[in-house]
């Protein structure tokens, strides 16, 4: 009897536990609604503080190159220099409207003069600053801070003079684009693309290379040249375009991973095997090995905002979809100012291949590549730049010359531009092989065609900011 009661109590308790556990409320949690979408849990971390850059301390009036008593439209009349005048002077390549917008939105700040008010010092050691208006009168030693994004707006005005309703460039733009041409024959056009000029334009971009080529680079043909490969907007160097449908098809095969080696013509296959592209890049740090082969597949992922994509190494990332990516590299010299020059030869053609391989595979991101090397840039700028001379073993450092023009965009500037340049390229002579392959077997080849080389080699000079970095690192050593 006692055992039956005990068993009944156990069953009763079990039933009660099951019953009330089902109706028990779940643990408390926060429900957030944004854009008609409900989210559980605490909110995500908000945006990080805006990254800022500082202008040099204000040197005084008049500014270099300005007349002391001249009245100007920048608001520096009457013997005073305003804040917007100083910003326009420093960022002379940026539109006045963009600079005015930064002032209107309250994005321009100034350090408290002389840092005299100790009570304003923040506990975390941050520099105390205040927002200023465009007509703030500058005093000697004043220091202005702006968002880093303003330096990314340095686009030459000659690219933005096309009216929004038309894609036809004006005479100055046509002349400028034609000066970029380094080689031209019946099959191809080779240009030395400057940085910040987009190659492939989207709907709102009217100044891309493909949009301007039809009007500026047709050179008498009914149709303009077409792109056969791409360079990133910030990347400079050799860019090849096809002038005819046949040459475009051949170039597409040449720039593919198969390198066009699928023809019965042995000379063509041999020329395709000899084809290569060579880039020069300035990287932060120095690879452990002086030369080598990077074989690291890449995957493209979409970030949380649903709009921005990013290329990552597929190895160890858990992504199944990936593309093979192979790059040869060679270090060109010793590390100077915490950086070293590297020669890159891509064997495959993948989006952002060189930038990701340098940043993630070698651990040495390219100078000016803030997408794949922002944290390394931040740490690099905070470190003392002292290096060891490889032959003598003595320390040396880079002499930092005075003057704004010397440092703009170079390795010494606050925000360096991307230091990646397609310097050299070897291609099959498309015009010659098209003539040979289209020639009837019974017809003899013209002597002038036979004498032409099977390969064409091109070399493009570096843009100004990379030339400055090269000269500084090779000539200004203490």
Swiss-Prot record:
PROSITE patterns: PSI_RLU. GO terms for cellular component: mitochondrion. It comes from Arabidopsis thaliana (Mouse-ear cress). Its main location: mitochondrion. The lineage of its organism: Eukaryota, Viridiplantae, Streptophyta, Embryophyta, Tracheophyta. It comes from the Eukaryota. This is RNA pseudouridine synthase 3, mitochondrial. The active site is at 232. It holds the Pfam family PseudoU_synth_2.
């Amino acid at each position: 009897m006692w055992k039956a009661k005990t068993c009944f109590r156990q069953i009763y308790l079990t039933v009660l536990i099951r019953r009330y556990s089902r109706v028990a409320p779940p643990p408390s949690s926060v429900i957030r609604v944004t854009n008609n979408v409900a989210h559980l849990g605490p909110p995500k971390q908000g945006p990080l503080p805006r990254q800022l850059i500082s202008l040099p301390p204000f040197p005084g009036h008049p500014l270099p190159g300005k007349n002391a008593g001249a009245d100007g439209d920048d608001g520096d009349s009457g013997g005073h220099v305003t804040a917007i005048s100083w910003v326009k002077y420093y960022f002379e390549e940026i539109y006045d409207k963009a600079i005015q917008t930064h002032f209107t939105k309250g994005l321009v700040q100034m350090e408290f003069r002389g840092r005299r008010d100790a009570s304003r010092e923040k506990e975390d050691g941050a520099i105390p600053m205040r927002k200023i208006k465009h007509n703030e009168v500058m005093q000697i030693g004043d220091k202005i801070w702006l968002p880093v994004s303003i330096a990314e707006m340095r686009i030459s005005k000659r690219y933005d003079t096309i009216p929004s309703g038309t894609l036809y460039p004006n005479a100055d733009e046509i002349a400028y684009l034609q000066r970029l041409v380094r080689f031209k024959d019946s099959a191809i056009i080779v240009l030395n693309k400057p940085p910040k000029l987009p190659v492939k334009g989207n709907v709102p971009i009217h100044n891309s290379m493909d949009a301007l080529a039809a009007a500026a680079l047709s050179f008498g043909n009914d149709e303009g040249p077409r792109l056969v490969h791409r360079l990133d907007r910030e990347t400079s160097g050799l860019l090849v375009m096809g002038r005819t449908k046949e040459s475009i098809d051949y170039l597409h095969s040449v720039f593919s991973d198969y390198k066009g080696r699928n023809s019965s013509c042995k000379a063509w296959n041999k020329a395709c095997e000899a084809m290569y592209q060579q880039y020069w890049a300035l990287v932060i740090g120095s690879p452990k090995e002086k030369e080598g082969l990077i074989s690291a597949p890449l995957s493209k992922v979409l970030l949380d905002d649903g709009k921005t994509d990013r290329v990552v190494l597929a190895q160890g990332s858990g992504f199944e979809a990936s593309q093979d990516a192979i790059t040869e590299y060679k270090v060109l010299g010793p590390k100077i100012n915490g950086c070293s020059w590297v020669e890159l030869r891509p064997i495959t053609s993948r989006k952002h291949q060189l930038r990701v391989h340098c940043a993630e595979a070698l651990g040495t991101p390219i100078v000016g590549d803030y997408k794949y090397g922002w944290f390394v840039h931040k740490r690099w700028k905070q470190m003392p730049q002292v290096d060891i001379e490889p032959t003598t073993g003595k320390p040396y450092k880079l002499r930092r010359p005075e003057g704004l023009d010397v440092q703009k965009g170079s390795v010494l500037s606050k925000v360096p531009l991307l230091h990646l340049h397609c310097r050299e390229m070897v291609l099959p002579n498309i015009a010659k092989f098209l003539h040979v392959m289209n020639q009837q077997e019974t017809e003899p080849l013209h002597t002038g065609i036979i004498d032409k080389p099977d390969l064409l080699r091109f070399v493009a000079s570096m843009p100004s900011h990379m030339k400055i970095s090269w000269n500084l690192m090779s000539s200004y050593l203490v």
